[in-house]
Amino acid sequence: MSPLKTCLRAAIASAVLLVTHAHAQSDAAGPVATQAGTVYFLRDESGFAAMLGTQAFDRFDARRLAHFDEAGSNGSITRALMQTDTGPVLYDFRRNPPLVQRAGKRMTVQRVFWQGDEVVMQTTAGWYKLERGALTKLQSSTKTYH
């Protein structure tokens, strides 16, 4: 096999591996089964209300609903990263009521990787991680996210 074919196959395999570990974007408004209970995202006058059952636990401005979800072993959502007009918002459904953490920086999220308690985001402004409410811009490194 030629070196070019070997290199091409390795590149394709790497791309497939990367895509399988990145979490896809969803626009589901609900019902969404989470560890905290059933969640709905209802449109209101300026954006959306995040409802756990019949109680609103957050409101955010957004033209459209977009979120990246992490599913637990039983298939229910454990965490979700919401795309809002003011930047990403992390909902941690492992707690009841859900923990809400705002990134505090306007950016458009393209891909999300869940790493323990941190969420790593590829955005239009570069790579960032959100951990315990702190947003950090990531520098080039050899760490692999999957």
Predicted regions and their residues:
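Bacterial N-terminal signal peptides that target proteins for export
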Residues: 1-11
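A general, composition-driven signal for non-globular sequence regions
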Residues: 3, 15-17, 70-73
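Bacterial N-terminal signal peptides
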Residues: 9-19
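Exposed acidic/polar residues on beta-strands and adjacent loops within beta-sheet cores, strongest
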Residues: 24-146
